[in-house]
């Protein structure tokens, strides 16, 4: 057999190189010569060499606090986490979250209130069936291509985990409000991240959503905030960014 190429040698020394992905790395690198070897490995590991919703894997650890649910990782239709009802002063209508996420959201909202900021939930846990109805409505309204940029297909929504909250409003103008600025600055202190940040649409597959927060625990949230990552990049699903906290 012939000698390994320079790109293969560069890939093999990366701690997050998966040999079984080598063919995908090489193909993706050829299609994207502007990317570094590290970026090629990172993006292929995330799944970005494939169109969204292709090569979907079923989530194996749905109860993990850092569970990855996205356009490549899907929850089963019958998955339902352990939930508690959110206090009525903190939500619009009846709503449910996992207990720790609820307790931390309550603590965050209480602190925000002392600083003149009001935060409340407008959408938290959604069942598979509810998400199916939400998504179908958006597809009917805007067509599938556009709907896919702002709404998850059933099974691919983080809302099904009971770890996600839409705060205050799902209006693009929210990002310019004092509430949104406070949320972005302080949510990591309570274990939340802005799940779909501005400028990361190619990685998350979603438009910027300054209102959409996801509970991952304080330590992980602070790392994600510090390095300006998405959850996909943090988990890596093995990435160029792994070293600061894994090394």
Predicted regions and their residues:
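Extracytoplasmic cell-surface/polysaccharide-interacting catalytic and binding patches
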Residues: 1-124, 128-247
């Amino acid at each position: 057999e012939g000698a390994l190429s320079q790109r293969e040698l560069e890939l093999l020394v990366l701690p997050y190189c998966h040999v079984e992905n080598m063919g995908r790395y090489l193909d993706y690198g050829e299609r994207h010569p502007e990317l570094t070897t590290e970026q090629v490995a990172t993006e292929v590991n995330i799944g970005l060499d494939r169109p969204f919703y292709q090569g979907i894997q079923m989530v194996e650890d749905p109860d993990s606090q850092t569970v990855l649910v996205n356009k490549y990782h899907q929850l089963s239709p019958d998955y339902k986490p352990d939930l508690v009802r959110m206090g009525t002063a903190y939500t619009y209508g009846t709503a449910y979250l996992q207990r720790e996420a609820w307790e931390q959201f309550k603590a965050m909202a209480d602190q925000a209130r002392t600083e003149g900021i009001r935060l409340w939930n407008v959408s938290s846990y959604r069942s598979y069936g509810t998400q199916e109805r939400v998504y179908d409505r958006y597809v009917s309204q805007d067509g599938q291509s556009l709907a896919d940029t702002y709404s998850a297909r059933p099974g691919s929504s983080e809302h099904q985990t009971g770890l996600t909250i839409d705060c205050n409003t799902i209006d693009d103008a929210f990002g310019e409000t004092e509430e949104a600025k406070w949320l972005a600055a302080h949510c990591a202190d309570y274990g939340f991240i802005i799940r779909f940040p501005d400028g990361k649409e190619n990685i998350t597959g979603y438009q910027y959503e300054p209102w959409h927060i996801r509970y991952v625990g304080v330590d992980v949230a602070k790392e994600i905030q510090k390095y300006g990552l998405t959850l996909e990049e943090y988990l890596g699903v093995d990435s160029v960014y792994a070293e600061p906290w894994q090394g």
